[in-house]
């Protein structure tokens, strides 16, 4: 809901009535999703999930790019169908890429946070990303998924796989299984347990390349402008 609230706060002046009504519906759907996930986490209400960040986060299997030895990391919990996540990908991520990732100043990692109630096709898109990992093409698929929202049918995903040079038979067989759904939902549950109310959700922290453990420094709960990331990342780099 943080991203939705941010959009209402920053864009209400130019939004149509239908757009505002849709945002309200998104908020209600996300509340329902959070309540359902809270039950899976032990019956706590959504408000009770807002808590301090954990002392450590295990990121052993998280796809990453940037410096393999950097001790400062940016972790994104995101949804391939979320409009605010897509906006971040198209407008803010290129600046982060150029300023921090391509220059090997930080390690950037991606984690799953699909919200089924808002985006029914999203879980399938996240499964496709995991299937691409099997053929060492995660980032190629990741980029295709964010630039083709709303077209995450099995046929469309197979077309994306062909575009990036995957073995489409192996890929199609992979997305037809359910072997990654549990880990994707665990990632979503973990994000909510940290107080994430919506997507995207980011954490900047100190990373140990040997143990793959992240010590969180600061959470960024929403699709904020590059300047917000710059301020927090620069502070972390100055104190590494």
Regions found by a protein language model. Give the residues of each.
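C-terminal cap of thioredoxin/glutaredoxin-like
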Residues: 16-24, 28, 159-240
């Amino acid at each position: 809901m943080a991203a939705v609230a941010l959009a209402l706060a920053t864009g209400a002046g130019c939004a149509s009535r239908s757009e505002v009504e849709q945002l309200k519906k998104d908020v209600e759907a996300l509340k329902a999703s959070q309540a359902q996930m809270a039950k899976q986490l032990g019956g706590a209400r959504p408000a009770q999930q807002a808590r301090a960040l954990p002392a450590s986060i295990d990121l052993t299997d998280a796809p990453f790019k940037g410096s393999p030895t950097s001790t400062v990391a940016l972790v994104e919990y995101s949804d391939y169908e979320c409009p605010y996540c897509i906006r971040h990908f198209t407008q803010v991520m290129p600046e982060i890429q150029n300023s921090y990732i391509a220059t090997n100043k930080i390690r950037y990692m991606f984690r799953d946070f699909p919200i089924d109630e808002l985006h029914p096709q999203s879980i399938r898109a996240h499964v496709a990303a995991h299937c691409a990992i099997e053929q060492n093409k995660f980032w190629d698929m990741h980029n295709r998924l964010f630039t083709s929202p709303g077209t995450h049918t099995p046929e469309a995903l197979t077309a994306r796989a062909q575009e990036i040079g995957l073995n489409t038979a192996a890929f199609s067989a992979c997305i037809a299984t359910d072997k990654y759904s549990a880990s994707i939902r665990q990632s979503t549950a973990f994000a909510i347990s940290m107080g994430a109310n919506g997507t995207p959700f980011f954490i900047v922290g100190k990373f140990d390349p040997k143990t793959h453990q992240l010590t969180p420094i600061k959470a960024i709960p929403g699709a904020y402008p590059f300047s917000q990331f710059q301020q927090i990342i620069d502070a972390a780099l100055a104190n590494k």
